[in-house]
């Protein structure tokens, strides 16, 4: 009995340490991957202009690294440089870029700017659920409940099982 108790505790400790080391190694892997992607896009942007997909990907990497200013700059560069913004195949990316800019400004507590970018995303893609939910949240924050409810209704018409719209709609009633 006395011998099995320390073995049991050591086994539990070993399992805990193995799990903990696995989690840390996954985090390190994510950090190194993010850093290599950032460096790749940084080098590529120095050598030539980034296309719309690369610019969007670079902006996402900048957000993940909490380089919000750089993400804003890169997003605006992509939107400004690209003359193919009106093509339908780029509409989804452009809507995501506008939504991403809205998200950055929302996190910086610049709700008016965020609202403008969410509206632009919806202009590009009227059924973009994420931007619709984000704009509705802005209206909630500014106590414009009727507009928020209308946007949540639109989301629920597109996707009836949308958890965000269902939850917020119940909350604002």
UniProtKB/Swiss-Prot annotation:
Coiled coil: none
Keyword vocabulary terms for this entry: Chloroplast, Plastid, Repeat, TPR repeat
PROSITE patterns: TPR, TPR_REGION
Chloroplast in keyword set: yes
SUPFAM superfamilies given in the database record: TPR-like
Localization per record: Plastid, Chloroplast
Pfam families associated with the record: TPR_8
Keyword Repeat: yes
Xref: Gene3D superfamilies: Tetratricopeptide repeat domain (1.25.40.10)
TPR repeat ranges, renumbered to this chain: 52-89, 95-128, 129-162
Any single Gene Ontology cellular-component annotation: chloroplast
Family: Belongs to the ycf37 family.
Protein name: Uncharacterized protein ycf37
The species this protein was found in: Porphyra purpurea
Name of the encoding gene: ycf37
